[in-house]
Every structure is written in C-alpha cells, then in structure tokens.
Amino acid sequence: MLSSNPGPIGVFDSGYGGLTILHGIRQLLPEYDYLYLGDNARAPYGPRSFDVVYEFTRQAVVKLFEMGCHLVILGCNTASAKALRTIQQNDLPQIDPNRRVLGIIRPTAEVIGDLTTSRHVGVLATEGTIKSESYDLEIHKLHPDIEVSGVACPFWAPLVEYNEADSPGADYFVKKRIDEIMRKDPEIDTIILGCTHYPLLMPKILKYLPTGVRVVPQGEYVAESLKNYLERHPQIEQKCAKNASVHYLTTENPQKFKEQAQIFLHEPVEVDNITLG
C-alpha cells in the first residue's frame, strides 16, 4: 500500500547526469524535499533497447513511489524518450492514478521556439534519444516551422562519468560531433544538449561551436516547467513535502557515487545503496 502522506519529489536518472536537472530544480524550488535515484549499476541506458529502458525505468519509478514520492521527474533523456509515455498511459492507472511521472524533453521543446531565430535547431544526445526522434516529434508538434537535426554523441557521457571532461580526448570527440552537426545544417543557431551529462562539457562545446550559436542546457527550463506544473496542479503540490531536504540513492557503490556527485553538484552528499529489479 503506497503512503498518502506528503513525500519528496523523486528525480530519476540512469547515472549522474540527472544531478544537473536536480540542481536546476533546487535552485528555483529549494523549499521542497527531493529524493534522487541513480541506476548507476546499469548505466548507460543510451544504447539499450526500448523494452529494457522501459522496464528499468518502471522499476525505478515504482521504487520511488514506494519511498513516498507522489511526483517523479525522469531526469534522463533516454528514459523520457523510451519509457515515459508507456508508464504514463499503461502503468500509472494501475499503480495509482493520482501519482505523476514527468519527462524532460517536453519542457525543452516548449521554450525552443522563443530561442531560435533561424528556425534551425540541432540536438546533441545519446544514440537512443536520437533514434527515438523524441525531440523532433515534440518540437514539430509545438513549432511545425522549425527544422531539427540530430547527432548522436556516444562518447560524451562516458567522458563525464570517468572525469575526463578536461582531457585531450574530450576535445577530439566534442569537436568531431560539433563539426558533424554544423555540416549537417549550417543554418543551426541553437543547440539542445539532449543528455543531462553534457552541460559538464560546456567549455569544450562552446570552444568548437561557431560564434553566435546558442546552447540550451535543460536544467533551468525543466525547473521552470515544474514550477508552472505545481502551480497548475495544487492537488499534486500539496503532496510534495517541504523541509528543504535532499537524499540520494544509487544502485552502485555509494562511495563512488559520492565522489562523482561532487563533480556535478560541487557539494558533499549523503547516499545509500539500493537494489532494483
């Protein structure tokens, strides 16, 4: 039986990248409690099939519900692309129709129309997110006139995970993908970082992008979207506890998570190990 008492807002990611989303949310909405779950033991999700990503994401969402969350944010583009819709349509009605799961692709798609002048947008993301065409679909639904080009960046997330963001290898792989997307569509004036790890590569990304091309990290837009959502849905907002606390869970070694999390958050964290599946 799931608790009906107010609980934390859950944030889920396959690894550490969702910490950039959590950071953005906490900057704007510091008063709420948060519970972050990283399925680091099974990361990365990017190359995995739709079915596997859905099953892993469903397990995480159920666990967060069991731990008191009434609202869960999928702070992972791959999970948002491959699992969100099925969970919303098929699982929530059976688990608890009053609970909510939100993704991070839609909030980015909503604001992109105000950010691009040329109406040509690039998406840099994992292979799974690019193959799903989720950004193309969401952007075209809202802004049919915008041309979207995507490029998969398979080595970018591991560069961040293994603390290699400042290495010469990072320069090589970042330049390679930036050159590729600008060749694909030279009229691009706005780039969406469609993986939550990528903001940590921002100095390298800006180094190789042509002058005047804007980069859109997701954290601030997801936070603004969540704020608006809670204002529009008071019945959900009332179920979100407000003690300004944050706790972290990982499916891997907690000590490793602590060390990596500090790269993303620049602050020490308390973390517990958890098993999914």
Each model region followed by its residue ranges:
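Non-catalytic structural scaffold of enzyme domains
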Residues: 1-277
